[in-house]
Amino acid sequence: MFGVLNSSDHRAAVQQRNIPAFGRTSFELWTDNPTSNYRCETGGNGRDSGQNRVRRPMNAFMVWSRDQRRRVALENPQMKNSEISKQLGYQWKMLTEAEKWPFFEEAQRLQAMHREKYPDYKYRPRPKALPQKSDKLLPAASSSMLCRQVLVDEKWYPFTYRDSCSRAAHPRMEDQLSSSQPVNIANSLLQQEHHYCSTSLRDSPETLAMHLSADPPFYPK
């Protein structure tokens, strides 16, 4: 009889351990996680800085807005906290010096109490979180394609080029502009620019490096 009870207890214990996680409540899972308990006791980040951190004494505006913020939030529950702060800041600026003076006195009293309680206190602002840089390359924007106009025989012709192929095309463009055929220059320039753009993609890395190190773009006057 004693052996049967032990085996049944053993099976119950095994079944209890094999209960899937989705069959248990989130509170049970949270209490079984020692990391969660540690975060709860230390303030959320595994450190006790949340409980031991000394807050700054309130200034005059904070003393005044403490009750005003609560009142505005109750009157306008749909208003966001940022909008409430803007409204309170505007109302504070509209107050006269006589109306602000009682709050300055209260702030001075709170600061004196704070100095007595924390004589070694020094304000240390929290470092601002830096945005994480993405390692992924963004696609080329439409601004990488530049549009220029070429003046030929007192007429402006649109000329579109990309930075990757314009450096190789500009030396020959300069020679073309100095010739005496103004009518066909624009068409020949566009054809050469299309040819250099299409062939530069098939060039070797050495050839591309030579193109990039060529003379700067030529801009006709």
From Swiss-Prot:
One family name in Pfam for this protein: HMG_box
Protein localization: Nucleus speckle; Cytoplasm; Nucleus
CC terms in the record's Gene Ontology section: cytoplasm; nuclear speck; nucleus
Transmembrane spans: none
SUPFAM superfamilies in alphabetical order: HMG-box
GO molecular function: calmodulin binding; DNA-binding transcription activator activity, RNA polymerase II-specific; RNA polymerase II cis-regulatory region sequence-specific DNA binding
DNA-binding region per UniProt: 54-122
Alphabetized InterPro entries for the sequence: HMG_box_dom, HMG_box_dom_sf, SRY, SRY-related_HMG-box_TF-like
GO biological process, one term: male sex determination
Keywords: Activator, Calmodulin-binding, Cytoplasm, Differentiation, DNA-binding, Nucleus, Sexual differentiation, Transcription, Transcription regulation
Main location group: nucleus
Biological function: Transcriptional regulator that controls a genetic switch in male development. It is necessary and sufficient for initiating male sex determination by directing the development of supporting cell precursors (pre-Sertoli cells) as Sertoli rather than granulosa cells. Involved in different aspects of gene regulation including promoter activation or repression. Binds to the DNA consensus sequence 5'-[AT]AACAA[AT]-3'. SRY HMG box recognizes DNA by partial intercalation in the minor groove and promotes DNA bending. Also involved in pre-mRNA splicing.
Assembly and oligomerization: Interacts with CALM, EP300, HDAC3, KPNB1, ZNF208 isoform KRAB-O, PARP1, SLC9A3R2 and WT1. The interaction with EP300 modulates its DNA-binding activity. The interaction with KPNB1 is sensitive to dissociation by Ran in the GTP-bound form. Interaction with PARP1 impaired its DNA-binding activity.
Family: Belongs to the SRY family.
PANTHER family noted in UniProt: SEX-DETERMINING REGION Y PROTEIN (PTHR10270:SF161), SOX TRANSCRIPTION FACTOR (PTHR10270)
Protein name: Sex-determining region Y protein
Originating organism: Neomonachus schauinslandi (Hawaiian monk seal)
Biological classification of the source: Eukaryota, Metazoa, Chordata, Craniata, Vertebrata
